Design a protein with these regions (language model features):
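Active-site beta-loop-alpha junctions of metal-dependent nucleic acid enzymes
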Residues: 58, 76-97, 101, 111
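Short small-residue beta-strand/loop micro-motif enriched in glycine and branched aliphatics
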Residues: 70-76, 127-129, 153-155
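RNase H-like two-metal-ion nuclease catalytic core shared by retroviral integrases
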Residues: 17-21, 104-106, 112-116, 126-150, ...
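An active-site-proximal beta-strand-loop segment
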Residues: 35-74, 80-81
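C-terminal domain-tail junction helix/linker
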Residues: 113, 120-122, 146-202
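Basic, flexible linker segments flanking DNA-binding modules
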Residues: 1-38, 191-201
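Mobile genetic element proteins and their domesticated derivatives, centered on retroelements
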Residues: 1, 30, 45, 71, ...
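Generic structural signal for secondary-structure transition and capping sites
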Residues: 6, 35-39, 96-99, 124, ...
Length: 202
């Protein structure tokens, strides 16, 4: 890579403390079926984003939902609070099919009564990663990694210079690009949206 003058951007992981509820467990239905071969799987998680210039706290929080089979991001929510509403408001934005699996880690929001009742009303099945196995939720984790390495040259510095509204606008723009323009080599260079259209026709 050096001979070609190429530089590979590697984002350093930052440790953040997240509330987990290990007392509530659900079967890992997804079972690393990353391409949704056996079930119609949707994955969700929350990521920490450095606070914009007009927010007086260390982080803001983003919840997102990805479709395993097509890799399309179907909804996201940005909030000042990492609470149940962050996740539940996002789930309500997604038009799920009649039968689906929603996979997550053991974040406290995903074991809350409100969340579990919502998934039941939507006729979905809850799936949870094994404790301490981040790879079980690889698809959404990978998307967050792409977001933080490809959205800006320096994600943290860029975010800290903008307002919360500007951040939300940039996130909308990035996700639109990710879904509609970012081609996936694994799937013959189709975009997530193209794969989603094919999936919906079946």
């Amino acid at each position: 890579m050096k001979k070609l003058g190429l530089v590979c951007r590697i984002r350093k992981a930052k440790r953040t403390k997240e509330s987990k509820n290990v007392a509530v467990t659900f079967q890992n239905i997804a079972s690393r079926d990353y391409d949704g071969i056996y079930n119609d799987i949707y994955a969700t998680d929350v990521t920490y984003i450095p606070s914009p210039i007009d927010v007086d706290q260390n982080f803001v929080y983003m919840s997102a939902v990805i479709h395993h089979k097509t890799k399309k991001i179907l909804g996201f929510n940005l909030s000042l609070y990492n609470d149940n509403s962050l996740v539940i408001d996002n789930i309500k934005k997604v038009n799920f099919p009649k039968n689906f699996v929603i996979h997550s880690d053991h974040g406290s929001q995903y074991s809350s009564k409100e969340y579990l009742q919502l998934i039941e009303r939507l006729n979905g099945k809850v799936s949870m990663s094994r404790i301490g196995n981040s790879l079980d939720n690889r698809e959404i984790e990978y998307f967050f990694s792409v977001l933080k390495t490809e959205m800006f040259e320096n994600f943290e510095k860029s975010v800290k210079k903008m307002t919360l509204k500007e951040l939300e606008r940039h996130l909308n723009k990035f996700i639109d690009w990710y879904n509609n323009e970012r081609m996936l080599k694994k799937f013959n260079y189709k975009t997530p949206h193209e794969l989603w259209v094919e999936f919906c026709k079946k």
